[in-house]
Amino acid sequence: MKPSIVAKLEALHERHEEVQALLGDAQTIADQERFRALSREYAQLSDVSRCFTDWQQVQEDIETAQMMLDDPEMREMAQDELREAKEKSEQLEQQLQVLLLPKDPDDERNAFLEVRAGTGGDEAALFAGDLFRMYSRYAEARRWRVEIMSASEGEHGGYKEIIAKISGDGVYGRLKFESGGHRVQRVPATESQGRIHTSACTVAVMPELPDAELPDINPADLRIDTFRSSGAGGQHVNTTDSAIRITHLPTGIVVECQDERSQHKNKAKALSVLGARIHAAEMAKRQQAEASTRRNLLGSGDRSDRNRTYNFPQGRVTDHRINLTLYCLDEVMEGKLDMLIEPIIQEHQADQLAALSEQE
């Protein structure tokens, strides 16, 4: 391993020990905000510190085994130990390289999830409902909180569009690769001939930004309409214009929110989604420029990005970005998504490592 990388790892290991000491300090414990920030930093440094400690131990093992090679009686055993230690050292170096990759600052944030029915009419709306249920199950398993911001139901069930905020540890980092087109192939319940239909939905995942980082939105650029809510909320919903529709005139982005009884709360929610959408549009432009020079696994939430096909008759799900096919569709639709999410994260890390080695 390069001396510059070892020096960086030593500094991170020292910082990990320093943060550990600070977390036990009475002044830190009294300051809840600082305590939370240090706890997050400690968690982020723990893996790299542990891995580096293991690597240091293996280097000592290699040194010991090399010294034993001079002893004729110990040579054979030393050769075995040396081979094992070198293999372990290589594995740990690869892990450390991944742990040192630049982190996306948005990865730890909450996220807005949008699922929209595309081509396929009623069947697309039903599939949008299935996808939202799949993500909700996944969130539940990870102990994340799902809060519906806005929903437009399909005529025969499912959703034409649904927007939810998902809160918890590392939500955006896990879900960001879901953005893009999701295609379903199955026999609709209304199909009497048993023919397979193909429908599509688009998914967009955007990080929730803290107020300080929200893009500046000029109030003059907004058209705000109020209307009567339709949906849950008891008798109150249809008696006041509590639902909000905000149009951002320069970009044409429209956000609706009718989940809360209070117009003020709906407006605040709609503005937070609008800020995230404007930020996402800016990020997509930047990624497009990057994608012209390098493969980009992050979808834009556009229908043209074909992420996955869910084939119900075959019980098959295929991720087209990494040519991964699994025959466990029922489990996937029940929210067991890690088997699809992990490989795409690993592929993304491999791309990052390739980009770094090219720069070097």
Curated annotation (Swiss-Prot):
Keyword terms, alphabetized: Cytoplasm, Methylation, Protein biosynthesis
GO molecular function, one term: translation release factor activity, codon specific
Superkingdom classification of source: Bacteria
One Pfam family it belongs to: PCRF
Main location, first listed in the record: cytoplasm
Cellular compartment(s): Cytoplasm
Function comment: Peptide chain release factor 1 directs the termination of translation in response to the peptide chain termination codons UAG and UAA.
Protein name: Peptide chain release factor 1
Annotated source species: Escherichia coli O81 (strain ED1a)
Gene name in the database record: prfA
